[in-house]
Swiss-Prot record:
Coiled-coil ranges (or none): none
Designated gene of the protein: pyrH
EC number(s) on file: 2.7.4.22
Listed GO MF terms: ATP binding; UMP kinase activity
Organism: Shouchella clausii (strain KSM-K16) (Alkalihalobacillus clausii)
Protein name: Uridylate kinase
Amino acid sequence: MYNRVVLKLSGEALAGEQGYGIDPTVIQSIAKQIKEITELNIEVAVVVGAGNIWRGMAGSAQGMDRATADYMGMLATVMNSLALQDSLEAIGVESRVQTSIEMRQVAEPYIRRKAIRHLQKKRVVIFAAGTGNPYFSTDTTAALRAAEIEAEVILMAKNNVDGVYNADPRVDDKAQKFDTITYMDVLKDGLQVMDSTASSLCMDNDIPLIVFSIMEEGNIKRAVLGEKIGTTVRGK
């Protein structure tokens, strides 16, 4: 069992079947699953994506300035983070949102030592606004924050896949799922686990990653308890 984890949630996971925005039923289910692992005395930090609201890369592809599009994505992660905080606190889980871009009226600024102190007090810390810099994904944010707070693992909860495959299982019936794989293989084979910056950061800092489906309730707890689930990525 892990003692301190970073949970990476894709923005799309929050949209549920509607595909856009925030599905209250889904976010309440995720909040309950997070509560389950906090009750095991596990320290939990969360990084949320923004794909349910906005994608910087998509805006850039349509002619928008890339940096501007990325900043819009960072703001969208704050909306998702506040929604998750609200769902957590509604069921009695104390939490804090920390943002990489200061907006003191709605959240704390990101301060590493303060984040660690919150975790030690068993508060869930939600890291929002990415790294605060354009051109960096929320996957990279998860890797960076995991290294900074010395998390033991990153739990990557996906909404459309249950692990890492050698091909896209949605289009290739013969795609095979890996139980374990190395970061070097992920980078060498160009597997779509996380972007190369995030993968390299995890590899260099020896942070294992568990990729699994968020759609099956209880999977977060299973991953934390070390049950065989999804795909584990580690080492070189």
